[in-house]
Amino acid sequence: MRRLAAVALGGLLLAAGAVGAFAQAPANPVITTLTIFAGAAEGLWRSRDWGGSWERVQGAQGGAAPSGAVRSIHPIGPRVYVGAERQVLVSDDFGETWIALSVPGLVLAVLPSRYPQADSTLFVGTTEGLLKSPDAGRSFDRPTLAGVPVSRLEWPGPALVVATGRGVMVSLDGGASFTGPGTGLPGGDVLAIALSAFFVADPVLFAGTVADGVFRSRDGGKTWSPAGLDGQRVGDLVWLGPFLYAATAAGVQRSEDLGHTWVTLADGLEGRPVHRLLFPLAPASGAEIFAATDQGVWRSADGGLHWQRSGLNGRFVLSLGTFPPPLPVRGKKKG
């Protein structure tokens, strides 16, 4: 998981208004927001007050709306992509109205380009393989990695790194072909990946496995070595500065030494397994964390040391997302 630069929390959500379903997003939308999305086993939920209260996202009357299990949420503001049962849903008005794009298989991950104004590429990971759209979802190429579940996607460029049912695979040609999974990584599903912020020059990545803990590669996925949490299911990884966070059945785990040692951050989590993590202010701040569990959303305001409930009690939450923060405004230098 990698995130963009953040700014101080607060302010308003401003936009020029809704745009067409496939219209190009505004060049510089201002998004400083209190909105959090949560994908549950039975649809999409939204909080407009930083997890204080939640509402079901219904869409316009008679229109499409997210339903079924929502496993992936990717807001890029005002556009929001959601991966549901057998469809990708797209909103161009911050989640108020939606259109549905049918795809084969259950959708596990959705990843648009980091530069949507210039590049309309959209990748979709499903239980049936990897789909690529050159036009923001109007059409999809024939799937690659056919028959292989693709659960997570990272695209630092030029490499496309995917977590699959066969391990971690890497493509250098936009998903046309893949290499991997490399040596040293146990067979079976990889559920999470976290990449160096400077992956082109520093190709370090971590993989969270379904039953064997965390593994680390220093060479872009060619070779792997164990990085702790042996025997544990790792559903999410977030690498933030010196800290590596893992979502596990034992709660949230954190390492300060690239996986050599780990500490458990579970005070207040009531023993709940954690499936996903969201750091809405990263990388400027790692203090605020939201955690998706099988009994709702939890929130920490101190980097995971203490947790408290943040709504959707009793609901199995599978994914979390929020709008990326705006780029900082830079003044002109005097003189």
Label the predicted regions:
Residues 2-335:
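Extracellular glycan-interacting surfaces
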